[in-house]
Amino acid sequence: MKPLQDRIAHHVRSLPRSGIRDFFELVVGRDDVISLGVGEPDFCSPWHIREAAIFSLEKGQTSYTSNLGLLSLRQEIAKYVEGLFKVGYDPASEILVTVGVSEALDLVFRALLNPGEEVIYHEPCYVSYNPSIVLAYGKPVTIQTKVEDNFVLRAADVEAAITDKTRIILLNFPTNPTGAVEPVEELEKIAALAVKHDLIVVTDEIYCELLYGGSDGMSPGEHVSIASLPGMRDRTVLLHGFSKAFAMTGFRLGYACAPAVLTEAMMKIHQYSMLCAPMMSQQAAIEALKNGAPEVERMRRSYAQRRNLMLKRFAGMGLPCFSPGGAFYMFPDIRKYGLTSKEFALRLLEEESVAVVPGSAFGEAGEGSVRACYATAYEKIEIAMDRMAAFVKRLG
């Protein structure tokens, strides 16, 4: 019998395991560890959202929904998106409800890419981007952004990466793992490139409610989506969801907004793979969109306080750290210690029981940094920072 490992598809064999999950598994069952690793809110989903899911179950709403998702949810999404992103979509044909934003990402690449076609995206980046492109038989083309330039994606670098095989530009702002926010003037230049070269833009804006404006980061910042710029609505696929801002990670719910012909193509794949997102999750999402804004702002302000704490503590340790404009991550620079990001993270875990994620998990551009998530209780962050300070002091 041929060994089972030889039966695995070649393009799957080459996929690496998620660097985030590798470290998550190292801390499972260890009560002494303070995890700054997994990018998940420490807040429980607000009660009124959970109650909507419970009420849905009590009413016996346990069936399939339309492949596109409940029309009532798509109508609420359309209102929410128009208010937040300043761009309108037809809930009947231009919105697809998915099982998390990760599914939406998978669908858009499988719907749009032919084998060998290229997707340009910026690193450091979310760990799923490269594998999602590879699984759709596309070719990842990376642009390395740098802390010295505030992790800005420069349109000039995008233009230099465009070839006759380029089909998609993938954006993620605010960015995981850096918290960077793209300046509007660069978005405008990238939009002009998309029009000039007739490219589709896929924009993952899952963290857009979590912005930190003002000198102290406590004020809500202003988000601008590339989909709202002139000429971009009909060549953009806007991805968003409920996991981060609404603290609904376990509900596994996201959505894609795009012109009807693109939504239809994505839906055809979705109907054969997932069929639909869970009914009770969709009912909870309706409640989140209708009445969740105060809770989102309460959580955002709490993250802002933790952000400020972590920035202050890293500065006190002498660890250079970019000041994030959004999301809930810090990406301190650890290069001066002469360790790889994985070595640094493993030693910090072994010696001080603090879990962070090696920057290398987010692409080559992430090497030399580690990701620390501040979606963790303020008191735990204080303890983790004390431990980390002792660790870097020993490193000298």
Question: Model regions: which residues?
Answer:
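PLP-dependent class I/II
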Residues: 1-16, 26-29, 34, 38-56, ...
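A short acidic, glycine-rich active-site loop
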Residues: 60-64, 299
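Conserved N-terminal alpha-helix of the aminotransferase class I/II PLP-enzyme fold
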Residues: 64-99
